[in-house]
């Protein structure tokens, strides 16, 4: 009758519900060996289950809001590029930067800052 049916990818479910965050060094957007290993496990799961991903880049509180927005985006883009190299389609991976706006730890310590220098996969 002229209607359209648009199929949407199902969100990742099952064991992929807990995708791993990856962490970065200070002022870095380069993936560490640990980050690459975590992303390889995540990519395998997503390939098996299907679905779309959103990569959220985050930073610690140091630096300007503008600088950290750009750094968070570089982190998200680095993750997307690596996942693409593992066979995930770029069209199925969205990226966003939250800069320093979504800390998971708020203490002014190196240990806390390290927890905030991350990319979360959703």
Language-model features and meaning:
Residues 1-53:
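Periplasmic peptidoglycan-binding/tethering modules of Gram-negative envelope proteins
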Residues 58-122:
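Periplasmic OmpA-like peptidoglycan-binding domain that tethers envelope proteins to the cell wall
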């Amino acid at each position: 009758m002229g209607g359209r049916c648009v199929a949407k990818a199902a969100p990742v479910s099952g064991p992929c519900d807990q995708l791993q965050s990856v962490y970065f060094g200070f002022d870095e957007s380069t993936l560490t060996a640990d980050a690459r290993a975590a992303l390889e496990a995540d990519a395998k799961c997503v390939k098996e289950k299907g679905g779309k991903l959103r990569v959220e880049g985050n930073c610690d509180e140091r630096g300007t809001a503008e600088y950290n927005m750009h750094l968070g985006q570089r982190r998200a883009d680095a993750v997307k590029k690596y996942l693409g190299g593992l066979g995930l389609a770029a069209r199925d991976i969205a990226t966003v930067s939250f800069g320093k706006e979504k800390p998971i730890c708020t203490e002014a310590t190196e240990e806390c800052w390290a927890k905030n220098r991350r990319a979360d996969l959703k």
